[in-house]
UniProtKB/Swiss-Prot annotation:
GO terms for molecular function: 4 iron, 4 sulfur cluster binding; 4-hydroxy-3-methylbut-2-enyl diphosphate reductase activity; metal ion binding. Belongs to the IspH family. This is 4-hydroxy-3-methylbut-2-enyl diphosphate reductase. InterPro entries: LytB/IspH. The lineage of its organism: Bacteria, Bacillati, Bacillota, Clostridia, Eubacteriales. Isopentenyl diphosphate binds at residues 43, 78, 128, 220-222, 266. Pathway: Isoprenoid biosynthesis; dimethylallyl diphosphate biosynthesis; dimethylallyl diphosphate from (2E)-4-hydroxy-3-methylbutenyl diphosphate: step 1/1; Isoprenoid biosynthesis; isopentenyl diphosphate biosynthesis via DXP pathway; isopentenyl diphosphate from 1-deoxy-D-xylulose 5-phosphate: step 6/6. The gene is ispH.
Amino acid sequence: MERNVILAKNAGFCFGVKRAVDEAIKYQKEFGKKIYTLGPLIHNNDVVNYLEDNDIFAIELSDTNSLNKGDVVLIRSHGVKESVIKDLTDKGLIVKNATCPYVTNIQLKVKKCYEQGYKIIIVGDENHPEVIGINGWCNDSAIITNGKTELENIPAKVCVVSQTTEKKETWNKVLNEIVKESKEIVAFNTICSATDVRQKSVQELSKEADLVFVIGGKNSSNTTKLYEICKKECPKSYHIENVKELDESLLEDESVKTIGITAGASTPDWIINEVISKIKEL
């Protein structure tokens, strides 16, 4: 049966993630030994396995106590608290920073505004490593909200930033709440421009598609948000990590004429292409 397969614009690796992966591989070759990343370099199991095959391993912060002086630790694209970088350096470790420049920009804005007496509000997931890291640049004092519950006791003087992968509608909702309560507001819409374009693109795609596959790690924040957006417009939207999770029975439905494909920022092209090729085979 003839089907139309549409790949969303900006699907797959974003600038920050690609940069982090390239940096990790570059440093492994440069030092010629194991490279350690604080947490998985990106939220994609297939890519993590690929990196391990190239002597690049994810560890937790507590594991750095077991490393030797001169071992190489790479800060991933999500970034870390300011204090973490100092602690690693004090241990005699070689620290390489692959924090996404967009995240670094948020960290520096937060630090500056915090020092100027602003209460920091972060719109995002309090358990996400990017948000945890940003909070560390204001002495872990930020108010963190995902927009699902109303903010209470909002200070009069606030600085508002967002997780780079947050949904635009959540940002707008929280900002509207703050405007009603605070007298002095410095707001930086720090949603990554690529994230914004990606979300708008999948929203349009899911309106015209009969079936949508969102490809990316189940632990990937931005992929999950893309899936949520797709599901609103197209009930037949499915979040899969790779071609192995492609449910072929979904393609037996003769009413499915147009299939939309999108992918999170941690999904490499080869995983996307495998899914598209499989769909076209069936």
